[in-house]
Regions:
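Short, Lys/Arg-enriched N-terminal segments with co-localized hydrophobic residues
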Residues: 1-6
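Cysteine-nucleophile amide-bond enzymes
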Residues: 24, 30-250
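Sec-dependent N-terminal signal peptides of Gram-positive bacterial secreted proteins and lipoproteins
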Residues: 7-29
Length: 250
């Protein structure tokens, strides 16, 4: 285990997007005190919402094979947890409070079926949708120290998710990197961008964007890291809106 329980950790959050020139899907939200317009979300329980999201992903250029595999995971997850606390049909308008789920019940139901498999997290889910659109340098430097839960999930998954080459791309994309002991956001942005550039991380052939939330973990002056703590896939829709696909639970 890491030393999280023994040392004070300061974490800052940056948001990056790798842009092109489960189970929670959101439609646009305007975060402003001056508007009452808010987005909507779905847990993709019903066939109609899954069909709508599938079309948006395919229209963005994502592989039908990848999208179908992801939807299979969505249906398995929802079935396993018996749709506990999920939106049963379509999209539900977001309120000022975050959606609440019975996490203990969900965990109990999941562990009953999968005692060793913790499930696919946000990083695995996002990458699985876009894996054939992402490329990296063959000899890229990798630090997978913060991917231990991902590795455990892939090891105990009911089916093999990635090839050896895809796993290398996955670990390169989500690699942990050293950074400076500072709260200056620009410094960390440059560090992350430089690492992706050195490892030739590229996305092509799709209108989809990979959105990543980058955390700055600090244990003091001599131990500072950047790691990707959350990821999702953002795609445009034909009605000029945005659809964000993210996994919020193992």
């Amino acid at each position: 285990q890491r030393r999280y329980s023994h040392m004070k950790k300061i974490t800052y959050v940056l948001i990056f997007a790798l842009l092109v020139p489960y189970l929670f899907v959101t439609q646009p939200t305007v975060a402003s005190a001056k508007t009452t317009h808010r987005g909507a979300y779905s847990n993709l329980v019903d066939a109609k919402s899954r069909k709508e999201v599938k079309k948006a992903l395919l229209d963005a250029g994502l592989s039908e094979k990848n999208v179908n595999a992801w939807l299979s995971d969505v249906k398995d997850y929802n079935k396993t947890i018996k749709n506990t606390g999920l939106v049963k049909k379509g999209f539900k308008k977001l309120s000022t409070k975050n959606p609440q789920y019975d996490e203990n019940k969900i965990m109990e139901l999941w562990n009953k079926k999968y005692p060793d498999f913790i499930g696919y997290n946000c990083r695995i889910t996002a990458f699985d949708l876009m894996k054939d659109k992402i490329s990296v340098k063959a000899d890229a430097k990798v630090n997978a120290s913060n991917l231990f839960m991902d590795q455990d999930a892939l090891k105990h998954a009911p089916a093999k998710k990635f090839t050896k080459k895809q796993k290398h791309v996955f670990e390169t994309l989500y690699s942990t990197l050293n950074t400076a002991y500072t709260t200056d956001v620009d410094t960390h942005i440059k560090k992350q961008q430089k690492a992706w550039k050195q490892n030739e991380v590229k996305i092509s052939g799709t209108k989809a964007s990979l959105i990543t939330v980058v955390f700055h973990s600090s244990f003091g002056e001599n131990e500072n890291e950047l790691f990707i703590g959350h990821a999702g896939v953002l795609v445009p829709t034909k009605d000029k809106k945005l659809l964000f696909v993210e996994k919020l639970s193992f």
